[in-house]
Amino acid sequence: MNMRYTLMPERREGPVDPMPQSPSPSDEGGGPRRPETGSPDKDNLLKRMRKVDPKQAERYRQRTGE
């Protein structure tokens, strides 16, 4: 049985940046962004909750002190 081994050159590592900077979304110019949403109005939230589940809305009012 005749075996041949091919010698591979040793792997060289190039200079490494000690602090690689991750690209920020503003640098890339594209990509998804977090939507600008404020907290929902509490009265509006309670009205919507009452439509869906009145008992849950009542428990939420008691829990939050509304």
From Swiss-Prot:
Top-rank taxon: Bacteria
One Pfam family named in its UniProt record: UBact
Basic and acidic residues biased stretches: 30-66
Isoglutamyl lysine isopeptide (Glu-Lys) (interchain with K-? in acceptor proteins) crosslink, residue number(s): 66
One term of GO molecular function: protein tag activity
Alphabetically ordered keywords of this record: Isopeptide bond, Ubl conjugation pathway
Ranges where the record places region Disordered: 1-66
Family: Belongs to the ubiquitin-like protein UBact family.
Purpose of the protein: May function as a protein modifier covalently attached to lysine residues of substrate proteins. This may serve to target the modified proteins for degradation by proteasomes.
NCBIfam families, per database record: ubiq_like_UBact
HAMAP family: UBact
Name of the protein in question: Prokaryotic ubiquitin-like protein UBact
Protein source organism: Nitrospira moscoviensis
